[in-house]
């Protein structure tokens, strides 16, 4: 039984049978709610009224239920040939159902390429089961993914919240404290980096609906539920999450990622992709790649996936080299303050007449050159985002 694909064998304390009987799973990282998704494969289950159902769920009475996809914590089913259903064995959030139940979100995003839920079942406030109109799994292109994610996030931009770097950095610390990597990384983030409501799309969850491609929105991972807060993340964070899945699961190369990025960039606010917003010394894309790999590391521990764990560990070792480079840049940045201090010394030396006017001007000019040169070199050597 513990061989179920959704079972967190790497951190589970209670047994699968105990967890399904009680609806609570005890893990090394804390307790979570869970349920036996297999019961909804029986047609009799659909005939029973359900307390925490919403939308059309209680109206459904399928005669045929077929599993289309098992993907870790997610199970995709086809109900007759009329609907599809997505079940989470461990419900992790209500972000997907909120797209239907929150009227301003629904009206804001209705013109995008999202596939909206039309019914569902909640467990302790999170999405256990979601119903969607009938659709068929399909493949798509980096152009479509970049444009679709960009359009979604651009619609959410007016609802953005201010830079929340303190909690974003705490999010990293929480993962580091539990996973004990040999890396520690924090970022100041540009002021233009803001939080938005989370809409997560995945390249394996793209559907064809009567000839139109749609992205089925997914909830957060189990490790994020257990180890991270609920704060909003920047649009760049979800872009990097999707980038990670394109590389990890679709084998995208750097040219395809560049195409994906350009189509996303064209559709989001320009300030999100400004030089400072993408600057590695301020966090930029690389800090969110670091976050994404920490989550991958956590998921590999959670599911006991050794190959994925080794891949994450290899990437984290490369972070040390990047951090060493950033350390050198911080030394160059200190030259700005050396230059400013030199100019201050020149001014007071002139005031106190300990240096002649010409010598003071020369010293001040040298300080200015040191400051400007250090700043220019600092930004010139900033590692590129791509």
Question: Where on the chain are the PLM-derived regions?
Answer:
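Active-site activation/catalytic loop segments of kinase-like enzymes and analogous catalytic loops
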Residues: 228-272, 290-308
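All-alpha amphipathic helical-bundle segments outside canonical DNA-binding/catalytic cores
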Residues: 273-291
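Cytosolic-side membrane-insertion boundary helix
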Residues: 314-341
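Juxtamembrane C-terminal module of membrane proteins
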Residues: 312, 377-386
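Hydrophobic alpha-helical transmembrane segments
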Residues: 349-368
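Alpha-helical transmembrane segments
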Residues: 346-348, 368-381
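Conserved ATP-binding subdomain of kinase catalytic cores across diverse folds
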Residues: 3-4, 9-186, 227-254, 258, ...
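Conserved protein kinase catalytic/activation segment
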Residues: 194-219
């Amino acid at each position: 039984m513990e061989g179920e694909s959704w079972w967190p064998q790497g951190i589970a304390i209670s047994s699968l049978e105990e967890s399904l009987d009680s609806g609570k799973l005890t893990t090394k990282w804390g307790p979570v709610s869970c349920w036996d998704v297999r019961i909804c494969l029986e047609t009799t289950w659909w005939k029973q009224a359900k307390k925490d159902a919403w939308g059309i769920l209680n109206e459904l009475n399928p005669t045929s239920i077929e599993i289309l996809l098992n993907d870790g914590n997610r199970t995709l089913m086809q109900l007759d040939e009329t609907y599809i259903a997505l079940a989470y064995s461990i419900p992790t959030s209500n972000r997907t159902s909120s797209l239907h139940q929150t009227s301003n979100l629904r009206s804001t995003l209705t013109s995008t390429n999202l596939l909206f839920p039309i019914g569902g079942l909640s467990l302790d406030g999170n999405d256990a089961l979601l119903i969607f109109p009938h659709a068929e799994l399909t493949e798509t292109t980096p152009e479509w993914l970049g444009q679709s994610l960009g359009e979604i996030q651009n619609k959410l931009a007016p609802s953005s919240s201010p830079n929340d770097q303190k909690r974003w950095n705490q999010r990293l610390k929480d993962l580091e404290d539990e996973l004990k990597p040999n890396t520690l990384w924090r970022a100041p983030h540009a002021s233009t980096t803001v939080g938005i409501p989370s809409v997560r799309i995945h390249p394996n969850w793209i559907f064809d609906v009567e000839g139109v491609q749609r992205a089925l929105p997914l909830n957060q991972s189990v490790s994020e539920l257990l180890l991270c807060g609920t704060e909003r993340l920047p649009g760049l964070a979800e872009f990097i999450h999707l980038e990670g899945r394109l590389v990890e699961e679709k084998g995208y190369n750097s040219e395809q990622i560049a195409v994906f990025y350009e189509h996303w960039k064209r559709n989001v606010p320009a300030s999100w992709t400004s030089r400072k917003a993408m600057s590695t010394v301020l966090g930029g894309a690389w800090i969110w790649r670091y976050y994404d790999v920490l989550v991958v590391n956590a998921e590999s521990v959670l599911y006991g996936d050794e190959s994925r764990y080794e891949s994450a560990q290899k990437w984290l070792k490369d972070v040390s080299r990047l951090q060493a480079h950033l350390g050198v840049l911080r030394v160059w940045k200190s030259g700005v303050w050396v230059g400013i201090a030199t100019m201050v010394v020149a001014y007071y030396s002139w005031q106190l007449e300990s240096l002649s006017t010409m010598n003071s001007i020369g010293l001040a000019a040298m300080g200015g050159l040191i400051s400007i040169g250090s700043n220019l070199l600092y930004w010139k050597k900033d590692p590129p985002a791509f």
